[in-house]
């Protein structure tokens, strides 16, 4: 068995990564909330929060598909920025009474797990490939 074959066998699929799944879960939650908002909110906050929440998992996917470690880390860090942007939009939506208590608690449960998972994912990339 060649070393290439060994590496291929241990490569984890993108869709099996917990951090990717959590990013997808958060963006689906945002997407499902969007339809309940008035058109004004959809055209302002709605578009922004959909883009930022979708970018979390999309940037993980793009980084995962990149060849060089530097490229991977760049996109994983973009994902972290999109995560923070999404949290900001959620806080703003909460303050403007666009998200009710129960739904915000559901968002918070995912955020509380996704944040540390994303940090650990980025840190593991740094350990494996250097800063």
What function would you assign to each model-found segment?
Residues 1-131:
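Amphipathic alpha-helical assembly/interaction segments
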